[in-house]
Curated annotation (Swiss-Prot):
WD repeats lie at residues 345-385, 407-446, 451-493, 495-535, 585-624, 629-668, 763-802, 829-867, 870-910, 913-952, 959-999, 1005-1044. Residues 1099-1131 are annotated as: Disordered. GO terms for cellular component: nucleus. Tetramer. Interacts with NINJA/AFPH2. Interacts with SMXL6, SMXL7 and SMXL8. Interacts with SPL (via EAR motif). Interacts with SPEAR3/TIE1. It comes from Arabidopsis thaliana (Mouse-ear cress). Keywords: Jasmonic acid signaling pathway, Nucleus, Phosphoprotein, Repeat, Repressor, Transcription, Transcription regulation, WD repeat. Residues 34-92 form the CTLH domain. The keyword Transcription applies. This is Topless-related protein 2. Transcriptional corepressor. Negative regulator of jasmonate responses. The lineage of its organism: Eukaryota, Viridiplantae, Streptophyta, Embryophyta, Tracheophyta. It is found in: Nucleus. Gene3D superfamilies: YVTN repeat-like/Quinoprotein amine dehydrogenase (2.130.10.10). InterPro entries: CTLH_C, LisH, Quinoprotein_ADH-like_sf, Topless_fam, Topless_Znf, TPL_SMU1_LisH-like, TPR1-like_2nd, WD40/YVTN_repeat-like_dom_sf.
Length: 1131
């Protein structure tokens, strides 16, 4: 069919839609096969109208077209089958099995047998793979998410998912233009012609009434159904019958459709698949978004489900797709950060900038002087500055030592945050990279590497094989991959010029790196030693940088040629070809232009003393911003993750911050919080210092209370110290300078925090022994001393739109319809039993024990999937290996540690060294070690592959204290620092050196034994509970006390004869850093959060007041807050 005929079909579709002929619209979409209406397909799929779903699909593909199409039809028919089983319609299920699913038996007979066996089950959820299948609505939603991915990846749907962009009522416009042209040809044109028909050409009637009638003959061929997708020519010979064992080559296969001869990968390599493929289907497999697996029972707890449900709710009011004038809503200039809100002077030329991935107003800046600075752009303050210095000259190469002596000047080339924001990487113009660990407002030296000979041109973080790594490139034409201990994992050779930039990325489960060199070559590498997978020429063939859009779906590059011509392009990944070339650059540039992307919609480039913006879908320049002047010729720029702030360099050695409306709101909110916090702090300090001369420190109280109250106040050391701190410039509490004492906030009243008690949790017989949040953050799981596990879940509703755990809403005590309990085997005398528990990463299974066998429970059905490791000895601690859920470290009652392989039901090795039972286990993937702790107050460090003992260390106990008591261990997010808790102390260890670096001991208001401790989810806080009911919040970097939560704030007043109630265990929410949960000695479980006003621990809120920092809740100084300085151990 000609392109004009095809466009006519689109005009008719638009006309039918505007005239509300909805059924005709979808019928024409199906019959023409030109436009697949994904919204209509979604509506029918979620409504379960399976016949219409398949009928509509049939206009675009058939079951056996390719493996994408096969899996699409399989998922639809499988869902149809499961729904019949779910409503107990066995006859219908058998019919679907025989008529609809039988076709797939020839491709995967084993799967067909497994599906057939579901008929024999009373509830198909008894099948392990279907145990997470929820209700029909949620299952359809998950299915649709999978179908959408398959459709987008299917080459038969290429160019058919987006409706062309043209003006509304275009067909009417063309007809009117035709009529106007016909009217101009009239011999006697009338001023207001009367158009009565379109079947005949228009002609104004002559005066005598005669009319000339001319039939219309449109030069348009009859509409025919398009032919099937014609693949690109298969290169490299016939299809290989033996598929590759791993799908690595498939990720970049599209780029290899016509590779240069230098490509080192055999062209016939494709991903393994259980279905036989014809040679004509090879190129259809060469698409970067292949299905995650072949026909199978999908995960009904998909990560995409939550986002999908949000979108479904927002789309309920308009299910039908419309055909707008543009395929995407026009880009609003208001979405762009164009307004200058601050100008900050750095002092030397700014070379590189990067916003923190979660703290959206924290900007890292690298300079030509080698200096690295963190700026809080909300308050326009420097958080920390690190001048360049060599950390360990002796470890550097002789070449570098000679170079730095000869020419000591050095510049930053790149600063980059790790995806989790815990690490900051810096590369330099001579050999070195530095990696800092970021802690609140502090940068701690973590790793220095002499990485390349000459300049290190770029640095980025990647996560191959679930291991955080640093990727670098340099003038030595090499790309290198390093782990966080400084070990070199890979060296990629193949570029013939200095490597200019790198772009690590992941598509599905394939991880790779794009690299560009100064000769304009683009190469791609997998994390192996095979060599480059791609060899392409970048536009301009000189300095080029590559970036993906925020959602990772679109690839862009920007660069400049040696002649000064600049290029900004979008790539078609599936074909390795240019998709768009953006217009708007001036003729010649005197350097290399820099660019960035944001919101999956906009591109920004610094050129000609301006910032130029493009909409990704339009090659024409969207707008230009001069930022009130003062920009250099080629300014460098960087968006924050939300896209509401933009940093751009200035000509006078500084940078400007530009914001849109959302960005302004973010900055104002930050300023308001900083002002309130500082105002409260200053008010308190002035008042206390005025009283200090006449009041003894021992009786200076924050609030009036009985002497016997558990919330007894902390004395103010002296008025002079308090007054001196009033002169300090206040700053955001989350970025306090650690060299200065933190202020202590006392929370003594229930109005000063939010709390909720889990329903049906109180049990005087069973104490809460272990407590966990689910990894998704929607539930709390408690293991009692009686071996029974209880689960509470928060429901998504208007009061709790996220569905996450919150202290503002009471959760549900969750149990399956069967009424089963998750009860462990318990010995006849359970008093000496040590309960232990571990949860799988996807929240599907929980493993626990309480003096008996270890049981693996299904979290949906509460059924016991298997048991193992019967006593003696009994298990006392459980930990999944972070990289292999089939490997479990099990601490035992006899002081040994068993490394157990679930798959083969075998203990692989036993680790011995402790003298008493094991009380804690923690893995570090960064250091590849396992740390164990025992009731003997000992720590052991083991290698996590050979399981050899590296070192043992006894924790430092107070004089006269016997080495007994549970010792717990937990790794910081950086996988280097280790939190060690014992009833006598909290300690932070540097696990890479196996040395204690900070310690805090109970004292004064917090003098009772410590019962439990945990890092917050971002590892910036440490929560600790005490035997007298107090809860303390510490700054994680230094163990300085930030906040004390008295028992009176979250527990009722005890009666005279009642047993004391206190927290047995404390745990932190996996996504909310200021939310904690405690399990109490009376069996109850509580979730606690700061008040709505303060939002963070350490910001005072008055009891019974709606203002922060007045009287009761205000912060106070405490010697307990500062004792870590005296106990700090030198590194």
């Amino acid at each position: 069919m000609s392109s004009l005929s095809r466009e006519l079909v689109f005009l008719i579709l638009q006309f039918l839609d505007e005239e509300k002929f909805k059924e005709s619209v979808h019928k024409l979409e199906q019959e023409s096969g030109f436009f697949f209406n994904i919204k209509y397909f979604e509506e029918k799929a979620l409504a379960g109208e399976w016949d219409e779903v398949e009928k509509y699909l049939s206009g675009f593909t058939k079951v056996d077209d390719n493996r994408y199409s096969m899996k699409i039809f399989f998922e639809i028919r499988k869902q149809k089958y499961l729904e019949a089983l779910d409503r107990n319609d066995r006859a219908k299920a058998v019919e679907i099995l025989a008529k609809d699913l039988k076709v797939f038996a020839t491709f995967n007979e084993e799967l067909y047998k497994e599906i057939t066996q579901l008929l024999t089950l009373e509830n198909f959820r008894e099948n392990e793979q279907l145990s997470k299948y929820g209700d029909t609505k949620s299952a359809r939603s998950i299915m649709y998410t999978e179908l959408k991915k398959l459709i987008e990846a299917n080459p038969l749907f290429r160019e058919k998912l987006a409706f062309p962009s043209f003006k509304a009522s275009r067909l009417r416009t063309l007809i009117n233009q035709s009529l106007n042209w016909q009217h101009q040809l009239c011999k006697n044109p009338r001023p207001n012609p009367d158009i009565k028909t379109l079947f005949l050409d228009h002609s104004c009637s002559p005066s005598n009434g005669a009319r000339a009638l001319t039939p219309v003959n449109l030069p348009v061929a009859a509409v025919a159904r398009p032919s099937n997708f014609v693949p690109l020519g298969v290169h490299g010979g016939p299809f290989q019958s033996n598929p590759a064992p791993a799908p690595n080559a498939n990720a970049l296969a599209g780029w290899m459709a016509n590779p240069n001869p230098s490509s080192s990968v055999p062209s016939g390599v494709v991903a393994a698949s259980p279905f036989p493929m014809q040679p004509s289907q090879v190129n259809e497999l060469k698409h970067p978004r292949a299905p995650s697996n072949s026909l199978g029972l999908m995960d009904y707890q998909s990560a995409d489900h939550e986002q999908l449900m949000k979108r479904l709710r927002s789309a309920q009011t308009s299910n039908e797709v419309t055909y707008p004038a543009h395929s995407h809503p026009p880009a609003s200039l208001d979405d762009l950060p164009r307004n200058v809100v601050s100008t900050i002077r750095q002092g030397s030329v700014v070379i590189s900038m990067d916003f923190h991935p979660s703290h959206h107003t924290l900007l890292a800046v690298g300079c030509s002087s080698g200096e690295v600075t963190l700026w809080e752009v909300g308050s326009r303050e420097k958080v920390v500055t690190e001048p360049f210095k060599i950390w360990n000259m002796a470890a550097c190469s002789v070449i570098f030592q000679g170079s730095i002596v000869k020419e000591p000047s050095i510049s930053v080339t790149r600063v980059a945050w790790s995806p989790d924001g815990n690490l900051l990487g810096v590369s330099f113009t001579k050999h070195l990279i530095h990696v800092y660990a970021y802690q609140g407002s502090d940068l701690r030296q973590h790793l220095e590497i002499d990485a390349h000979v000459g300049c290190v041109n770029d640095l980025a973080f990647a996560h191959p094989n679930k291991q955080m790594c640093v990727v670098t490139c340099g003038d030595d034409k090499l790309i290198k991959v390093w782990d966080l201990s400084g070990k070199k994992l890979f060296t990629f050779e193949g570029h013939e010029a200095p490597v200019y930039s790198i772009c690590p990325h992941q598509k599905e489960n394939i991880q790779f790196i794009f690299s560009t060199a100064l000769d304009g070559k683009i190469k791609a590498w997998l994390y192996d030693n095979v060599g480059s997978r791609v060899d392409y020429d970048a536009p301009g063939q000189w300095c080029t940088t590559m970036l993906y859009s925020a959602d990772g779906s679109r690839l862009f590059s920007c660069g400049t040629s040696k002649e000064g011509d600049s290029f900004l392009v979008e790539w078609n990944e599936s074909e390795g070809a240019l998709k768009r070339t953006y217009l708007g650059f001036r003729k010649k540039s005197a350097g290399v232009v820099q660019f960035d992307t944001t919101r999956n919609r906009f591109l920004a480039v610094g050129e000609d003393n301006q910032i130029k913006f493009w909409n990704m879908d339009n090659t024409n320049l969207l707008t230009v911003v001069e930022a009130e002047g003062g920009l250099p010729n080629l300014p460098r720029l960087r968006f924050n993750k939300d896209g509401n702030l933009l940093a751009v360099t200035t000509a006078d050695n500084g940078f400007k911050i530009l914001a849109n409306t959302d960005g302004l709101r973010t900055l104002r909110a930050f300023e308001a919080r900083s002002f309130e916090a500082s105002k409260a702090s200053i008010d308190m300090k002035v008042s206390t210092s005025a009283m200090a001369s006449s009041i003894s420190p021992a009786i200076g109280k924050i609030e009036h209370m009985d002497a016997g109250s558990p919330a007894r106040p902390t004395p103010i050391p002296n008025g002079i110290e308090a007054m001196s701190r009033t002169m300090e410039k206040p700053r955001n509490l989350d970025s306090v300078d650690k060299s200065k004492p933190l202020e202590l906030t006392e929370i003594v009243d229930p109005t000063q925090c939010r709390q909720v008690t889990m329903p049906d949790s109180k049990d005087s017989v069973s104490k809460v022994a272990r407590l966990l949040y689910t990894n998704s953050g929607v539930g709390v799981l408690a293991l009692g001393s009686n071996g029974v596990q209880r689960l509470w879940k928060w429901i998504r509703n208007e009061q709790n739109p996220t569905g996450k755990a919150t202290a503002s809403v009471t959760p549900q005590h969750w149990q399956p319809n069967s009424g089963l309990l998750m009860a462990n085997d318990v010995p006849e005398n359970p008093e000496g039993s040590v309960p232990c528990i571990a949860l799988s990463k996807n929240d599907s299974y929980v493993m626990s024990a309480c003096g008996g066998k270890v049981s693996l429970f299904n979290m949906m059905t509460f059924k016991v999937m298997t048991t193992f490791m019967p006593p003696p000895p009994a298990s006392t601690f459980l930990a999944f290996h972070p990289q292999d859920n089939n490997i479990i470290a099990i601490g035992m009652e006899d002081s040994s540690i068993h490394i157990y392989n679930v798959r083969v039901d075998e203990v692989k090795t036993k680790l011995k060294g402790h003298q008493k039972h094991i009380t804690g286990l923690a893995f570090s993937t960064a250091l590849n070690i396992l740390v164990s702790s025992g009731a003997d107050a000992q720590l052991f460090f083991w290698t996590a592959d050979s399981w050899e003992k590296k070192k043992s260390s006894a924790i430092q106990l107070p004089p006269g204290k016997a080495p007994v008591g549970d010792t717990r261990v937990q790794f910081h997010n950086d996988q280097i620092q280790l939190l060690v808790s014992h009833e006598t102390q909290l300690a932070i260890y540097d696990a890479s050196k196996m040395e204690c670096i900070h310690k805090w001991v109970p004292q004064e208001a917090l003098s009772s034994p410590i019962t439990s401790a945990s890092y917050s989810c971002n590892s910036q806080l440490v929560y600790a509970s005490f035997a007298d009911g107090n809860i303390a919040v510490f700054d994680a970097e230094s163990l300085r006390l930030r906040c004390r939560i008295a028992p009176s704030a979250y527990m009722p007043q005890p009666t005279p004869n009642s047993a004391p109630i206190f927290p047995q265990v404390i745990t932190a929410h996996p996504q909310e850093p200021n939310q904690l949960a405690v399990g109490l000695s009376d069996g109850s479980v509580k979730v606690i959060e700061p008040s709505e006003l303060s939002r963070r621990w350490g910001v005072g809120v008055a009891a019974g007041s709606d203002k922060a920092g007045t009287e009761n809740g205000r912060p106070s100084s405490s010697s307990a807050a500062n004792n870590s300085s005296s106990d700090q151990i030198q590194r």
